[in-house]
Swiss-Prot record:
Quaternary structure note: Monomer. Interacts with CTTNBP2NL. Interacts with RIPOR1 (via C-terminus); this interaction occurs in a PDCD10-dependent and Rho-independent manner. Interacts with PDCD10; this interaction is required for the association of STK24 with RIPOR1. Part of the core of STRIPAK complexes composed of PP2A catalytic and scaffolding subunits, the striatins (PP2A regulatory subunits), the striatin-associated proteins MOB4, STRIP1 and STRIP2, PDCD10 and members of the STE20 kinases, such as STK24 and STK26.
Keyword Ribosomal protein among UniProt keywords: no
Protein name: Serine/threonine-protein kinase 24
GO cellular component terms given for this protein: cytoplasm; FAR/SIN/STRIPAK complex; Golgi apparatus; Golgi membrane; nucleus
EC code(s) of this entry: 2.7.11.1
Motif (Bipartite nuclear localization signal): 266-280
PROSITE patterns, alphabetized: PROTEIN_KINASE_ATP, PROTEIN_KINASE_DOM
Organism: Rattus norvegicus (Rat)
Listed GO MF terms: ATP binding; metal ion binding; protein serine kinase activity; protein serine/threonine kinase activity
Phosphoserine sites (modified residues): 4, 308
Biased composition range(s): Low complexity: 313-324
The record's account of how the chain is modified after translation: Proteolytically processed by caspases during apoptosis. Proteolytic cleavage results in kinase activation, nuclear translocation of the truncated form (MST3/N) and the induction of apoptosis. Oxidative stress induces phosphorylation. Activated by autophosphorylation at Thr-178 and phosphorylation at this site is essential for its function. Manganese, magnesium and cobalt-dependent autophosphorylation is mainly on threonine residues while zinc-dependent autophosphorylation is on both serine and threonine residues.
BP terms from Gene Ontology: cellular response to oxidative stress; cellular response to starvation; execution phase of apoptosis; intracellular signal transduction; intrinsic apoptotic signaling pathway in response to oxidative stress; negative regulation of cell migration; positive regulation of axon regeneration; protein autophosphorylation
Motif segment (Nuclear export signal (NES)): 323-374
Gene: Stk24
Amino acid sequence: MAHSPVQSGLPGMQTLKADPEELFTKLEKIGKGSFGEVFKGIDNRTQKVVAIKIIDLEEAEDEIEDIQQEITVLSQCDSPYVTKYYGSYLKDTKLWIIMEYLGGGSALDLLEPGPLDEIQIATILREILKGLDYLHSEKKIHRDIKAANVLLSEHGEVKLADFGVAGQLTDTQIKRNTFVGTPFWMAPEVIKQSAYDSKADIWSLGITAIELAKGEPPHSELHPMKVLFLIPKNNPPTLEGSYSRPLKEFVEACLNKEPSFRPTAKELLKHKFIIRNAKKTSYLTELIDRYKRWKAEQSHEDSSSEDSDVETDSQASGGSDSGDWIFTIREKDPKNLENGTLQPSDLERNKMKDFPKRPFSQCLSTIISPLFAELKEKSQACGGNLGSIEELRGAIYLAEEACPGISDTMVAQLVQRLQRYSLSGGGASAH
């Protein structure tokens, strides 16, 4: 590949033809982030420890727009509460993204050994709020706030990570109406594809607060496709159990279904739960040490199992999701969108050239496309048949072209059946 699609016109991209393998020493693999693998590394010029995300652009063709988005947003950010970005280098088909090294793990990792106390929860939430306050003041929204996307340094500093679906708010109303994020943490207005703003991040923060307290988000036992229908329909989740009234009120304030009634990040920094409980971030080093001890014990117990392949340091942009179907829905390339719905690739268009051009079901871009991307990724990881998955995806597009709207009908029927199955005792109740 002579020229990468991201080689020119990308903010933050190094224009010098420097060889990243000469500038940086790549050490052990420490994570699997969005789009690529993450390595610990050394900047040979300064001897500073860095994180190196390496992406094969030939394998990540479908994610080029998201990679560009992440680099663009990170290169525009300058905050102690956002993961620092040092630059990008292109070598052959490999893109090297150099970032701040954060060796304390993700907030999700820190939950693995056991629950957090309310002082730890408040301290982490305060730092997330500082990051959100900065982003929102810069007219940016993160759109994928969750514990897995919150990273810590070895000294307890807390930083926001994974900006692959972040959005720039540019119009006078400061609204977006794109459908991105991770289902369990998504605000109702995002799922309904209504216009939304930075208050969508506040809803996700409320879900993250429940996640930090309980170890998982609400509805985690359900299939994400079902959750996409439950969140707009049901009352907002509440934090149940023996937690303090201020923490429950903090969650309740974030999880108001009316976005305008949710507080801003700046207002939440003054909430009594934060003021009364949050401590200096150095307090979190005890939590990091606990996680490292637990991880060492686990590696001894599981050394002969496939868990030896699991990344350990978690400089991972959301790479710690435990569920097989906790996918992040990413915004599609505008060039492949028409009237807000996903259009087929050139290959699919060639297959369908004899059909008249018609609009496609909305669910193709919001549900089916991300689902097939996840299927392909998991099939590739276990040596499955990628061709069969691609054939099935192509068949759905062909059926859609022949009968517009059939995919929306199919998904609606699937959800109804899931709900009936759930209510008849086959799973958790939808009510």
